Amino acid sequence: ALILSGGVAVENPKPLKKNLRKIKKISRQLDKRVHARNKQERLEGKKKSNNYRKLSVRLSNAQRKVANIRRDFTQKVTTILTTHYAHIALEDLNVKGMVRNHRLAQSVSDVAFGELCRQIEYKSMLNGIKVLKADRFYPSSKTCSVCGHIKQDLRLSDRTYHCAKCGAIIDRDYNASLNLL
């Protein structure tokens, strides 16, 4: 989720998660249809069946729909951010490392964080907006935005930040956004 300075959270539509069942179903159906499965069969002239062609069009349409939803969301959000805000702060996340983790890979790819950052940087350059990149090792989520106390034992599953020093209770992502600005 993107957290704006007013505390508003912009949720990603997660198009792949919503359409994954449909894509998998079409892929399974496609594998059952007659087509050349290797180079030898292609050389022998084994052709694709009409149903194979129809299903491959359905599969590409479903995949195109996911890509279009993702692109539309990214374009609209980056346009709003770069036209309404004077400063934008981004965390320099290790997206490649996050994609290597098999538990995070699909959801990180579905968000398209790299493309979002690239478009924010591009559009902010056009509009003359300053983009701040925070170091990936800066403890923005672990630092209290009220008193500055750093909480060492904050897990990813903890969605609210509870400060032991001043007693502040705040949403984890909103706390990080306040610390980045």
Locate predicted features.
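Positively charged, helix-rich recognition surfaces that bind polyanionic ligands
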Residues: 1-181
